[in-house]
Amino acid sequence: MATTDKKEELKASGTCMVVQNEKISTKNGESPADNIVRESNIPILTSHAGLNPRSKSGNESSFAGELSRTELEQILENPFIEHIEYEDEDYFTINGILYSRSPQEVIRCPIGRTGHVKVAEGTLAIAYGAFQFCEIESVEFPDSIVAIADRAFRDCRKLNHVDFGKGIKDIGGGTILGEIFTGCDRLHEVVIPGQVKEIGKLTFYDSGLEKITLPEGLERIGSMAFGHCSNLKEISLPESLIK
């Protein structure tokens, strides 16, 4: 069955099964997976998952106890989920995106999310792989953001605009893997804010970059930060770079 047909079937059924390896089934079918993570009546008629463990009625699913970070991430990696509502002592959601409380970080955006995303004020960091594989087209950071972890936006194939805000001072600096915007095919132009001192390794590797503006004051560029950017024909390096 084609992916589009499967998505429509799931929407029509109103239920899904979240399993390992991103395998799912409808209420009339059996899961092909060996290890089922959790079966629940998640209302996805609008690709919206209500997962408040304290809720016992309405359109939200009822769970016995709170969900772990791993369980939440597995749910959000279901490509048919666009929105989640959840709250416990450690995690909460704003506009359908999962955050941690202390420190406040973006933990995971649903893979099925589309359009523009504005990260909540007060957020300090974007966690590892937080937006990886999402279908968002643009993202806006608050000035409170100070760190972006490895692979945060890797393979966001529709991402075409990033507003870094006025707070972040390094983009991928100090990361182990880097690859923050690797595979972002439609990210053609990027303006690095004036306060940024470092761009980490592999940050824009194999992306669609055609033009990038680097500010005076930038001190370090990691290895292969712009590697395999075949459409990037020219780049002007600021004099502030430390050789």
Please describe what each predicted stretch is.
Residues 2-99, 104, 108-125, 133-147, ...:
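Structural signature of tandem-repeat unit edges
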Residues 129, 150-152, 178-180, 200-203, ...:
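Consensus positions within tandem repeat domains that build extended binding/scaffold surfaces
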